[in-house]
């Protein structure tokens, strides 16, 4: 019996490995200098009509037929070797021994770390806990179909809640150590409101009502001249998935206006809970802050001109200040080119806005990245500074002192 050999991949397009270098061959055809790669399986199948194949070669002499078959065998062998090389290369890059490998979606092209609240939550948590980690943007979902997920010492964990529990057990970190039993209960209740209710209203605004803007932010590498088409297809597939899952959840059965009313109630609840505190549960960070920030950041920076953006930057300004404090403290490479304000000037046009791409560190550690800079001797008071000259958005502003000072005026 004669056999045929081929390459089968579970995805029809290549994926961007970002800084994870790999053999680049699709880039040669697409004219791109970025590294691309794909992974799949070598499959073998029986040739039922080998005689027909030989007859299909026509009246070529036997030596040509032999050359054709030999060439096919060499191509199959080359495909197999390439596959094995890619697998070995991938395993070398993803060595999770004593290292946290964070799998998440590719960075969007608007300067925001992620369009996924849960990916942003997880990466922010790792920075808050000062845990070095390695990003991997392969696009592969976990065994449960979840994103993000991590690998640590060859163990794979998905679901942000289970990931955090896993890291607390393995590495002894605990952002909630300053919370009492009552505060822990409140924190969990707020987490469920944000992740199981507020999230769906954001998803509706992001992937249904504001789909065209989201499509512009989506980053798809490897599409070459078909990037726009692929982006359109991915966004509309995601839109259908979100609408179907929202309907199953129940919130998708309401009208658009009712969904936005529910969103506003959640945002007002968060604003009321935060008040004038530095963080949601008080002066100290907790896991809840990573959760809330991951979701509110979508309203702040990924939904331009929408109702949640107007609300958070207008009436609920304490939420905007809260987001800015966390962004500046834990994301020094995010929007570092326009730190003076969170608002666009009235004179700026849509075409004049530029976004700095996110810089990704091989192994990120906050202690190696953040260094306190010496304070300047003089300062000028602006509407965005407190009585000490600090920006109201800075992470080290003492909100209690600021409030007391304002009340004494």
UniProtKB/Swiss-Prot annotation:
Q: Taxonomically, which superkingdom?
A: Eukaryota
Task: State what this protein does.
Answer: May play a role in axonal development.
Q: Which GO terms describe its cellular component?
A: cytoplasm; membrane
TM ranges are 68-88
> Where is the organism placed in the taxonomic lineage, from the top?
Eukaryota, Metazoa, Chordata, Craniata, Vertebrata
Locations listed in the record: Membrane
| Gene source species | Rattus norvegicus
Keyword annotations for this protein?
Membrane, Transmembrane, Transmembrane helix
Q: What membrane topology does the UniProt entry give?
A: Single-pass membrane protein
> Which protein family is it in?
Belongs to the FAX family.
User: Region (Disordered): which ranges?
Assistant: 372-409
**Protein's recorded name:** Failed axon connections homolog
Pfam families cross-referenced by the UniProt entry: FAXC_N (PF19333), GST_C_6 (PF17171), GST_N_4 (PF17172)
């Amino acid at each position: 019996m004669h056999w045929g050999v081929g390459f089968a991949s579970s995805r029809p397009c290549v994926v961007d490995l970002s800084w994870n270098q790999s053999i680049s061959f699709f880039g040669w055809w697409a004219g791109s200098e970025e590294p691309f790669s794909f992974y799949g399986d070598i499959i073998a199948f029986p040739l039922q009509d080998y005689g027909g194949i030989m007859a299909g070669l026509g009246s070529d002499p036997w030596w040509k037929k032999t050359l054709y078959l030999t060439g096919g065998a060499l191509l199959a062998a080359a495909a197999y070797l390439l596959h094995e090389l890619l697998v070995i290369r991938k395993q070398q890059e993803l060595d999770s021994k004593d290292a946290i490998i964070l799998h998440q979606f590719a960075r969007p092209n608007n300067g925001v770390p992620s369009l996924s609240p849960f990916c942003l939550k997880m990466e922010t948590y790792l920075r808050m806990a000062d845990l070095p980690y390695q990003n991997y943007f392969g696009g592969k979902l976990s065994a449960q179909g979840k994103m993000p997920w991590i690998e640590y010492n060859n163990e794979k964990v998905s679901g942000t809640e289970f990931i955090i529990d896993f890291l607390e057990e393995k590495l002894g970190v605990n952002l909630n150590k300053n919370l009492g039993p009552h505060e822990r209960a409140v924190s969990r209740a707020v987490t469920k409101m944000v992740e199981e209710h507020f999230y769906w209203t954001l998803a509706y605004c992001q992937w249904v009502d504001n789909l065209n803007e989201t499509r512009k932010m989506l980053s798809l590498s490897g599409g070459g001249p078909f990037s726009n088409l692929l982006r359109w297809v991915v966004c509309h597939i995601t839109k259908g998935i979100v609408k179907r899952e929202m309907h199953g959840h129940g919130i998708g059965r309401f009208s658009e206006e009712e969904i936005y009313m529910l969103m506003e109630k959640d945002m007002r609840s968060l604003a009321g809970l935060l008040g004038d505190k530095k963080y949601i549960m008080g002066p100290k960070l907790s896991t809840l802050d990573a959760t809330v920030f991951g979701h509110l950041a979508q309203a702040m920076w990924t939904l331009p001109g929408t109702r949640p953006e107007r609300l958070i930057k207008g009436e609920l300004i304490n939420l905007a200040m809260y987001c800015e404090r966390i962004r500046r403290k834990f994301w020094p490479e995010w929007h570092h080119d326009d730190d003076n304000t969170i608002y666009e000037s009235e004179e700026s046009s849509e075409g004049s806005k530029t976004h700095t791409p996110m810089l990704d560190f091989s192994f990120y550690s906050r202690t190696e990245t953040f260094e306190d800079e010496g304070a300047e001797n003089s300062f000028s008071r602006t509407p965005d500074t407190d009585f000490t000259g600090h920006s109201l958005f800075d992470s080290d502003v003492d909100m209690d002192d600021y409030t007391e000072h304002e009340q004494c005026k």
